[in-house]
Amino acid sequence: MAIGQPFATALGCTIIWRAAGALFGPPAAGDYQGRFPMLFSQHTRLVHVDSPLGPEVLQLQRLEGREELGRLFSHELELVSSNPALPLDALLGKPMSLALELPGGSRRYFHGIVARCSQGAGAGQFASYQVTLRPWLWLLTRTSDCRIFQNQKVPDIIKQVFRDLGFSDFEDALSRSYREWEYCVQYRETSFDFVSRLMEQEGIYYWFRHEKKRHILVLSDAYGAHHSPAGYTSVPYYPPSLGHRERDHFFDWHMAREVQPGSLSLNDYDFQRPGTRLEVRSNVGRAHAAADYPLYDYPGEYVQSQDGEHYARTRIEAIQTQYERVRLRGCARGIGAGHLFHLSNYPRLDQNREYLVVGAEYRVVQELYETGNGGGGAQFESELDCIDAGQAFRPLPSTPVPVVRGPQTAVVVGPKGEEIWTDQYGRVKVHFHWDRHDQSNENSSCWMRVSQAWAGKNWGSIQIPRIGQEVIVSFLEGDPDRPIITGRVYNAEQTVPYELPANATQSGTKSRSSKGGTPANFNEIRMEDKKGAEQLFIHAERNQDIEVENDESHWVGHDRTKTIDHDETVHVKHDRTETVDNNETITVHANRSKTVDRNETVRIGMNKTETILMASLQNVGMGRMENVGLGYSLNVGMMMNTVVGLNQSTQVMKKKTLSVGDSYEVSVGGSDDGSKITLDGQSITLGSQRIELTADREILLRCGQSTIRLTPGEIEILSPNVDINC
């Protein structure tokens, strides 16, 4: 093949690249690095390879590459070397760059990490090697983690992941503001999938700016993050019929439009504002007949409407990037994904506008030295996938979102020294067993709601899980970012309250006093269901308060024992009835006081015995009446004193006997009216060794018509007949 002859391939652009060593003619077999060392030199080639093995060890024969906004680039290289035994491990994971010669003498670089390399059987005098270049971001597909991020914005989370893995070749070109995520979980996924799905949700994408020694990931979200490469602000279109052109140009154009949904609505729920409507909607207007079909999704992953509007807009913009695509094929060597350019010279004038390259494919072929022309022929072709520069680009969600496929257990955590750590909603924080990054404290997770047996408006049941207890955590929609506690379980450290299986028939609730409670400090309601030993046990560690707003009934089938170690107060605001069908015994070891504000009636069906070991005092404010149906007996062991403040009347319907063992004295304090004793009967007998009657004014003895009157001055005897016997 003559020097300068085009290389016959299907590629559309042939670049004539003359080799300086071609003037010597074709070398002999095996003589490329011997007699003709200049022939294995890269300075004569369109694409230069800079590998970890050195600048002249590997040379490019073929390149097929693809890059896309928000996606990992991949460049497949066919390389040749005069060394058939290159150490592949010296390439794996190392950076490698390609330098593509541009018009005017500048260069465009393709830089990447060797993700894969292999060796084939070779072709002629050269060994054949295959290398795949990927961005450093691709290495994140080779690492995974389970990790929690709290109170961070997505760009900060992404950059933290990059830095933690040792990467710093990135640039923040974001222009929008982003909300702070209270809780974000990387769960059983690669670090690449994690940051990718976060970017897709927030409408962030990336592309790579290539330099000789590195490639830089550019985080982007708007037009301002992009630029036109030098010399490629405007790129013309030349149809194939016009033949070869010296300047870079496009020779093939294809535009397609596709019906896409015209609007997207999102909705979500915020338990802190359960009555607030959070539905949002975003529209994109198009002029065709089927532009109004709506999409709806739930949950939208937000609790503030403005955040929902951002997500709805982001998602509908991602869909609308598929509405119109323009594909341009040609040999515009300096343009790649993330670049802007203006198309010119296309016959349809409305297509001569500014475009953003969202995807690019490259193909480069360089001749082998064994063709005899020194490797001078090379061809380059690119195919660009473009959107109108005025159309916002957003990545379509394609990264799988991790789904927690069942409940998990976790341990309740909190600050050091606390036993219960909760907020106004009864939420708690936990440490997941898979989390190797936290310190098992109050910062281990977000606040998690706790399922209760009953939940009403200021009513229901509540039991707050305590620090150290193991709980069951479920996830709403399987989303690791939306945990909710649905149960609790025992373990070997937090074990059951009753010894099992010996007490398998026991069930109940037993608490622990806090703070500083010991096993001896608890409240408990326990049921024993063992046949023949059934029991309901209630233990209050301190106070027990029972409120019954209407009736209360108690039934005890057998005995009841009640022991109160201190005082008891019973206050019955209306009537009280107490019935004892058999005997009742009341023992008061000290004093007893009883007050009846009005009447009291005591009825004893048979006998009453009252024993007072010492004195008895009874005060009656007004009258007192005792009715005894038959006998009445009063025994006083020693003295008895009866005091009547005014009058006293004793009435005996039949006989009365008064027996005094020793002396008997009746004293009547005088008055103007005098005193009177009336004894009616057949006989009154006074028997004594001495009887004395004393009166200050008069003593009168009367029997029938006879009287004896004694006054201080005289004794008068009146009788029909007086007999005095001496």
UniProtKB/Swiss-Prot annotation:
Keywords linked to the UniProt accession: Secreted
Per the record, what is one GO cellular component? type VI protein secretion system complex
What effect does gene inactivation have here?
Answer: Deletion of vgrG1c shows residual type VI secretion. However, simultaneous deletion of all three vgrG genes (vgrG1a, vgrG1b and vgrG1c) totally abrogates bacterial killing.
Which residue windows does the record flag with biased composition (Low complexity)? Answer: 507-518
The record's annotation in InterPro entries points to: Gp5/Vgr_OB, Gp5_Vgr_C, T6SS_RhsGE_Vgr_subset, T6SS_Vgr_RhsGE, T6SS_VgrG/RHS, Vgr_OB-fold_dom_sf
The Gene Ontology biological process terms listed for this entry are: protein secretion by the type VI secretion system
Q: Where in the cell is it found?
A: Secreted
- Region (Disordered): which ranges? 502-522
Cross-referenced Pfam families: Gp5_trimer_C (PF22178), Phage_base_V (PF04717), Phage_GPD (PF05954)
Q: Which SUPFAM superfamilies match?
A: gp5 N-terminal domain-like (SSF69255), Phage fibre proteins (SSF69349), Phage tail proteins (SSF69279)
* Family per similarity comment: Belongs to the VgrG protein family.
Assembly: Forms homomultimers. Part of the type VI secretion system (T6SS).
Function of the protein: Part of the H1 type VI secretion system (H1-T6SS) specialized secretion system, which delivers several virulence factors in both prokaryotic and eukaryotic cells during infection. Allows the delivery of the Tse5/RhsP1 toxin to target cells where it exerts its toxicity.
What protein does this entry describe? Type VI secretion system spike protein VgrG1c
